[in-house]
Amino acid sequence: MIEIESRELADIPVLHAYPVGQKDTPLPCVIFYHGFTSSSLVYSYFAVALAQAGLRVIMPDAPDHGSRFSGDEARRLNQFWQILLQSMQEFTTLRAAIAEENWLLDDRLAVGGASMGAMTALGITARHPTVKCTASMMGSGYFTSLARSLFPPLIPETAAQQNEFNNIIAPLAEWEATNHLEQLGDRPLLLWHGLDDDVVPADELLRLQQALSETGRDKLLTCSWQPGVRHRITPEALDAAVTFFRQHL
């Protein structure tokens, strides 16, 4: 059995799940990030499954999502990459808040996510060596190139607009896989993707798999590609994530 609560950590609304009676017991912990236009509540099945596996789970609402949503859907659709960047930047304070609660067992902290959350998890892993392992479900590690086709912040038609686009996207380069293959390959990493994904192309994670393989950094890599699956989490994907964290965290 598990328990689950809504609360704030570092002023960020989160879902907090854990095995029953172990709220204040140090446990291995997974921070799991949800997808775009969704919320931690919608993705709470991950919290349930991982807590049932004996883990502590923290699921933050992304900026302008869940209880942080401003109500302006049109504005949010143009803020995908800014939201991704802020979510990655918030990891440091979120991790510190978890540690301050004395919730971590032997610093065993992992990250995972789906879609935008999978990108968040990969970016955090690229910059934070304290992350023990990572699960990326239907995501990408190549932000600056994908931003031209997936929820672009604007469609540049003038030189000024191109400069504005570049200024929005440029900070993402510090977080993407291109410059951090060593960091992404030096600890266990799960990549899962539906091969018929109609939102985030499966080629995004296949590209990362190839880059890690070609540089000899795939020794700790687990890949799972599911034929016939579009942009959704399947029962098999959930099982793969739970099995992965059980084994590596």
What are these regions (language model features)?
Residues 1-25:
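N-terminal cap/lid segment of alpha/beta-hydrolase-fold proteins
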Residues 25-35:
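Short beta-strand element of the alpha/beta-hydrolase
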Residues 36-48:
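The serine-hydrolase catalytic nucleophile loop
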Residues 49-73:
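Conserved alpha/beta-hydrolase
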Residues 78-102:
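Alpha/beta-hydrolase active-site loop
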Residues 94-152:
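Primarily recognizes the serine-hydrolase "nucleophile elbow" in alpha/beta-hydrolase
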Residues 145-206:
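The feature captures the conserved acid-bearing segment of alpha/beta-hydrolase catalytic domains
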Residues 206, 214-249:
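C-terminal catalytic histidine-bearing segment of alpha/beta-hydrolase fold enzymes
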